[in-house]
Amino acid sequence: MKGDFGDSVVNKVYEYRVLRRMSQKELADAVGVSKQTIFVMEKNNYSPSLVLALRIANYFEVDINEIFFYVRKDETND
């Protein structure tokens, strides 16, 4: 299908949250989303908006590129 690239954004939200010994609910409250949003994001089943990705990176005091990664479809089909 034209325009369906299949690219994705993967993340290390789980790793950063666990290092801080935080629950999903605590992180969700800190960045203004639901616990379910954090859950699906950690499973890489949801790509956050740029604003949410920036909020999360800011919360953990790291560059957005430390947590979120753009992956092209052809890079995942090795």
Model region roles, listed by residue range:
Residues 1-4, 68-78:
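Short, charged recognition helix plus adjacent turn
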Residues 7, 17-19, 47:
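Short amphipathic helical patch at the helix-1/turn junction of helix-turn-helix
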Residues 11-30:
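Short basic helix-loop element that most often maps to the first helix and adjoining turn
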Residues 26, 37, 66:
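Residues in the helix-turn-helix
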Residues 33-46:
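Recognition helix of helix-turn-helix/homeodomain-like DNA-binding domains
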Residues 51-66:
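DNA major-groove recognition helix of helix-turn-helix/homeodomain DNA-binding modules
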